[in-house]
Amino acid sequence: MTTIVSVRRNGHVVIAGDGQATLGNTVMKGNVKKVRRLYNDKVIAGFAGGTADAFTLFELFERKLEMHQGHLVKAAVELAKDWRTDRMLRKLEALLAVADETASLIITGNGDVVQPENDLIAIGSGGPYAQAAARALLENTELGAREIAEKALDIAGDICIYTNHFHTIEELTAKA
């Protein structure tokens, strides 16, 4: 598994992920980039789950973004509908965390599109640890979104055996 965390604060949104890929109990690669930019760099997305499945979902999500002129929520709902109802897509095992300037969402294969409280997302095996750390930092510090995401990933990497300390971080800034 993995850890993906997204934090939104003071006009900045960040999605960050670790780089560990495992096959069963064996680490196969330590520098996988599980976070990327989509739709002309206006959307950032991260995945937890099977790498090949996630890349397929990224491609489909980018097509949905193009169909809906970059409208994140509409594209997410359409992807979730297809993911749930299409016989082949239903077999894909991954979770997506996506964000643009205004919204942060979790998209699941069950057809769920969730906009979490406080615009804080944490998915994957280290998600609960990263979420707890990020929430504590959001509530008790003035750190920026990027610093919070980095610290949350570090803490998850210290606790979760399926999360490492190689980070990929993407950030968007809201236009003034």
UniProtKB/Swiss-Prot annotation:
A Pfam family the protein falls into: Proteasome
Residue positions binding Na(+): G157, C160, T163
Keyword Magnesium: no
Catalysed reactions, semicolon-separated: ATP-dependent cleavage of peptide bonds with broad specificity
E.C. numbers: 3.4.25.2
Molecular function via GO: metal ion binding; threonine-type endopeptidase activity
Family under the similarity heading: Belongs to the peptidase T1B family. HslV subfamily.
Subunit details: A double ring-shaped homohexamer of HslV is capped on each side by a ring-shaped HslU homohexamer. The assembly of the HslU/HslV complex is dependent on binding of ATP.
Protein's name in the database: ATP-dependent protease subunit HslV
Organism: Salmonella typhimurium (strain LT2 / SGSC1412 / ATCC 700720)
Lineage: Bacteria, Pseudomonadati, Pseudomonadota, Gammaproteobacteria, Enterobacterales
